[in-house]
């Protein structure tokens, strides 16, 4: 938790994992909005993942991942046209997305960071440096 905002991290990176995540989110009581920060490797079924969890998300943010298999937030955004995340802001990396979303969120909201082990590792680094 950061300033009254629940932060959830999930390494799932396929539609099956996203469906399980959506089911879990649906059973958790929370008072506010749900923000999602999503970053995924270029070889993943990003549209299938977003579609599976979309019903649980109020606001989206996309982030880029470095590395040979990574992709920029803009490339991810292009692959998500027509999805619930089509209007999401793009952030250079997970750390900048975490900062931006936590600045926007209010106590009682929850922030989900998901899409890859790389995404969660970058989020953990950002969260630890923010404390």
Describe these PLM feature segments:
Residues 116:
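Active-site-proximal loop/hinge segments that shape catalytic or ion-binding/gating pockets
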Residues 17, 70, 121-122:
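Glycine/Thr-rich phosphate-binding loops of Rossmann-like dinucleotide-binding domains
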Residues 1-59:
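Nucleotide phosphate-binding/pyrophosphate-handling subdomain across enzymes
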Residues 6-8, 47-110:
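C-terminal helical cap/extension that packs against the catalytic core
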């Amino acid at each position: 938790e950061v300033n009254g905002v629940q932060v959830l991290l999930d390494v799932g990176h396929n539609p099956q994992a996203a469906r399980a995540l959506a089911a879990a989110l649906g059973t958790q009581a929370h008072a506010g909005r749900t923000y999602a920060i999503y970053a995924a490797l270029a070889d993943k079924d990003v549209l299938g993942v977003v579609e599976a969890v979309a019903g649980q998300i109020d606001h989206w943010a996309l982030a880029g991942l470095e590395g040979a298999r990574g992709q920029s937030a803009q490339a991810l955004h292009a692959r998500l046209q027509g999805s619930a995340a089509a209007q999401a802001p793009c952030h250079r990396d997970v750390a900048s997305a975490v900062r931006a979303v936590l600045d926007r969120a209010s106590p009682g909201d929850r922030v989900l960071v998901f899409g890859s082990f790389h995404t969660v590792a970058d989020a953990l680094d950002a969260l630890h440096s923010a404390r």
